[in-house]
Amino acid sequence: MKKTTIFVSILALFAFAGCTIDAGDPITQSFSVSGAYTDLSVEDAFDVTVSDSVNQVVITAGDNIMPYVIVKESGKSLQIYIKGWRSSSGTKLKAVLPYNAALAKVDLSGASSFRTAYGLSAADVELDISGASDFVGDIKATEAELDLSGASSFNGQVTATELHLDMSGSSDATVAGQVAGLDLEVSGASTIVQNVLDGKYALSCNVCTGSLSGASTAYLHSDGSIRVSLSGGSKLHYTGNAATSGCSTSGSSNVVHDVF
């Protein structure tokens, strides 16, 4: 009987923890940060924007949720999330960050978003966007790494020597800009979105390597070379005069030369 009571209590605890609660009325709270961080990690459906008119992290949340909001610095990382697992309805979670020129790595998860008019600029820039999250902003780097998964998205201009683009789980990237080397690992019905600028696709590279699989699609411009392996009904559309003899295709995949 005692074991049964304990088991029922545990089930009730999990059921309560999983309930959706009302976020409550919106309130705002400021959190002090040093500004020395180079990495940002955001979870739990926060909408993040960047401003040069604030000097603290400004959070807007429901008054029932605000006591559980965590904004903390750990080493070179700034972390923003909700303590414990909670699902809420009502007031949207928002965060306004002071502009930080040193920011070079952004990790978003749990349907979070990050929007900046200032972009990210560093020798190495890394984005890890997962769980239906999205990033809007430009990137300038020697080497840029973009990892998108779980129906996440990127929208911005990239200027880099090397761009590594890893996409999976129906993610999409709307990319413009010029890179010397483009390395693609695109799978699971993900898409580099068709984006035409001045009569050619807006993402331009000298050399493109990598793979497309699982009904994925990419649109790019190159006057150099494209050496990509395509499978599972994937398609690579390109403009320019790139050599494509190094490409391989299987499973109804193809490489398409588009002329506008």
What feature does the model see in each segment?
Residues 10, 19-128, 136-145, 155-157, ...:
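Acidic (Asp/Glu) and glycine-rich low-complexity loops/linkers
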Residues 156-260:
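Short, surface-exposed interaction patches in beta-rich subdomains
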